[in-house]
Amino acid sequence: MFVKQYDVIVVGGGHSGSEAALAASNLGSNTLLITTNLYNIGQMSCNPAMGGIAKGQMIKEIDALGGYSGIITDKSMIQFRMLNKSKGPAMWSPRAQCDRLKFSKEWRLTLEKKKNLSFFQSTVVDLIIKNYKVIGVKTILGIYIKSKSVILTNGTFLNGIIHIGDKKNSGGRISENSVKGLTEKLKKIGFFSGRMKTGTSPRLDGRSLDFSKMIEQLGDFPIEPFSYLSNLNILKQKKCYITHTNLETHNLLSKEFNRSPIFNGKIKCVGPRYCPSIEEKVYRFSNKENHQIFVEPEGVNTIEVYINGFSTSMPEEVQYKALLTIPGFEHAKMVRPGYAIEYDYFPPTQLKNNLETKLIENLFFAGQINGTTGYEEAAAQGLIAGINANLKINEKDPFILKRNEAYIGVLIDDLIYKGTEEPYRMFTSRAEYRILLRQDNADERLTHMGINLGLVSYDRIKKLKNKNKNKKQCFLFFKINKANNLILKENIKICDLLSRPEISIYDIIKLSLIKNFIKKNNIDKKILEQISLYIKYKGYLLKEEENVKKMYRLETIRIPNDFDYNQVKSISIEAREKLLNYKPNSIGEASRISGVSPSDIRILILFLIKK
């Protein structure tokens, strides 16, 4: 039934597991994907959307490296919006509303095209370990499957408990069993675990809603694909809608707080700070008269709509009564109730920066098992874990993205060195080099790395080369040619004209000289926007590049593996404990560890220089 030994076994078929399995198999590893239900591969367990603030950037990065989340998103997209357009370009973040069923179907089809990727529907309950090295897995039916490496991407399934009011039952997702025993086995080996909580909103029958009482939220045109390989042709986008809760909603929920597992003590673990339940919002912000609710279609051929902003674990009848008080929902029919789920995770400080565990060789963790929340964060970790599992078993150097290279680098660096005690989600504010890490330049930052790894297709290389050629040609044209600006009554170089804050690229392309050049050379709008951005933000970009060089200097000060921090008497006790625990490879890594102060770093540098 199974080959003698797989190169990589991926446990879990969500966003993280799917990316991990494809990355490993695309790099040549004979891979087995084990999941509890093959029909639920690539499920959107919560809202049917991809991208958003900082998350859209990560999808672009996954795509630039040769991952698939961007391609799948484009194939299932039913609405596109570019968020934060009123702010600077570092903040622009693409977001797509997706067809939930098509998204999952496309993942399954994509995975099944790989000849060296096999599938098995079962539950992994134990690992086979020899001399602190993983050599396989054991399933719930007692089947042993050997492998050179294992990637755990268990999502919310480890000892998952679902809460709806007073009712609670074991489950990793509604109507799906949780995974029991694996956490306990890992703890027995020496890992430590924690508990986290997340939740989802009710789904309603769209035919029962009065959309005339809501605010239409249309998609943006033109639609911009997430993948650099996609050519989108979506003629009609689905509408989303906005409505609001009110004091009647809040009063009804407040009276039933004692029936919420969040308030009555049944759920004791921490949920996502930036995605609280509706009852938490009403409680925390008692002075607010309303809260925004987004009504999002679940797909093209379904009546279901997702009620974004109304995540809840209240009893079903309370959820329903509260929903009826919202404008447009007066005659709503509930298709599925919202629920909360608590689950086990393993603090990510137990990992190396290639996502391999420090304790067990060739064992990798990715996704919510590491304390993150969100499809995009999970997919990014899966891609990196899949790459590094392949590299490790082939005795190659690990693939590690730096903080100045990608949001994915920021994500993993934060997890490894700072850890998390609440579900971690990515924001642009977490990246200190966010002007460099824009959504428009992910291919320029990362595709060459994907080429070196062997993940990037010829089509992708060809597209990037063509883009760079056109960009260089256009920039040179702007640099050497002058334009007669009738408004300013000046004849100046196009670059200088564009550097003025009151002049946009759209003003420039109206000039006949430039219009003819663009038409003749078939210059894409995105290239023009990138050149404009570089010219207008040149000072900021150069400053960030200088900051990167300063940080790089800290990274070059290496710390020996056997370095004894007890020798350094002047650093704080907390810093010494953290450094002994994390064992950073460089001063740069040490500086990012929570509890290690700039003063500790200065003392450490002086000590290393003297040595």
From Swiss-Prot:
Gene3D superfamilies in the record: FAD/NAD(P)-binding domain (3.50.50.60), GidA associated domain, C-terminal subdomain (1.10.150.570), tRNA uridine 5-carboxymethylaminomethyl modification enzyme MnmG/GidA (1.10.10.1800)
Binding site for NAD(+): 271-285
Protein's UniProt keywords contain Flavoprotein: yes
Pfam families: GIDA, GIDA_C_1st, SAM_GIDA_C
GO annotations of cellular component type: cytosol
Gene Ontology MF, one: flavin adenine dinucleotide binding
Top-level lineage group: Bacteria
UniProt keyword tRNA processing, yes or no: yes
Protein's cellular compartments: Cytoplasm
Binding sites annotated in the UniProt record for FAD: 12-17
Keywords: Cytoplasm, FAD, Flavoprotein, NAD, tRNA processing
Any one Gene Ontology BP term: tRNA wobble uridine modification
Cofactor: FAD
HAMAP family, per database record: MnmG_GidA
Similarity annotation: Belongs to the MnmG family.
Biological function: NAD-binding protein involved in the addition of a carboxymethylaminomethyl (cmnm) group at the wobble position (U34) of certain tRNAs, forming tRNA-cmnm(5)s(2)U34.
Quaternary organization: Homodimer. Heterotetramer of two MnmE and two MnmG subunits.
Protein known as: tRNA uridine 5-carboxymethylaminomethyl modification enzyme MnmG
Organism, as annotated: Karelsulcia muelleri (strain GWSS) (Sulcia muelleri)
Gene: mnmG
